[in-house]
Every structure is written in C-alpha cells, then in structure tokens.
Amino acid sequence: MQKTELVFPKFPTHVKVSKTKFMKLGYNKLYAGVNHFVREKIVKQVHEYVDAHIPKGLDISTPIGTHLHIYAPINFGSVRMVKGKLTWKPPHDRYKPNWDLDNLAFIWLKSLNDGLVKANILPDDTVEFLTSTSYTIHFVDDFEDRKLIYEIIHEQ
C-alpha cells in the first residue's frame, strides 16, 4: 500500500482571536459556545497554516484514507499562552496526562482534509473520495519537537 506523508512542523497551539487575546486550539472550544465570527477567525488561521504546508502539484488517485500522527509532549494540555508567548515546562516524573486526544486531532483532521480539497488534490472530502481516517499520538520530550505527520494512504 502506497503512502504519501505531509509534515506540518511546530503546529500552532493557539490562535489570535483579538488584539490581545489568544485561544488554545481544540475541538470542544471551537464548537461549544464560541461566537460564529470567532469560529471563522480561528478556522481561517488554521487553514492558512495548513495551506502553507501542502505541496503544490501533488497528484493522488482516489479513494484514499488518511492517518494523522500527532507528535506532542505528554503534558500538551498544560501548554499556555501568556501575554502572547507560549509557555511550557517539561512534566515531572509522575505526571498523568488529563487532556483528550480527540479535541486536538479533530480540528486538524478536518482542516487537513479541507486543505487537500482546496489544493485540488482531492475532488471532495466526501466518502466517495476519503473512505477512512484515524490518528495516533506520539509523545516527544520537548515541546519544540511537536509536529503533525499526515499520511495519505492510497487505496488503489
């Protein structure tokens, strides 16, 4: 089975929602009570990041599946934006993660799928062309090593 990998280094953790305010990216925050204008602003910033990292002229046959590999520290849930600056400290030895992978993965999966359509790589992200998607977390020791690897799995 042939695969194409797209790498998205140092993916954004927060997006700017006003001059001085940032919001951490997450599916729950995006769709649970956020004003639709703010939601549009957030989605636009995520799409801009995705669009900048999708190679031009990528040619794939459909249908495809996708798999998102998320590389992030085990304590990714404790990443904060303070006065416009990201803050993170390595976890202590007995740290137990308490954040949901789904909240991080869903927003990226949707944006990456949309990015393939926008780049004319995929005609549409309906089940006719995109038949499966999944995701996995891989823990890294340093926050600066965070990245997304989006595998396009050629099903034919």
Give the ranges of each region predicted by the language model.
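Catalytic phosphate/metal-binding cores of nucleic-acid and nucleotide-processing enzymes, i.e., regions
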Residues: 1-156
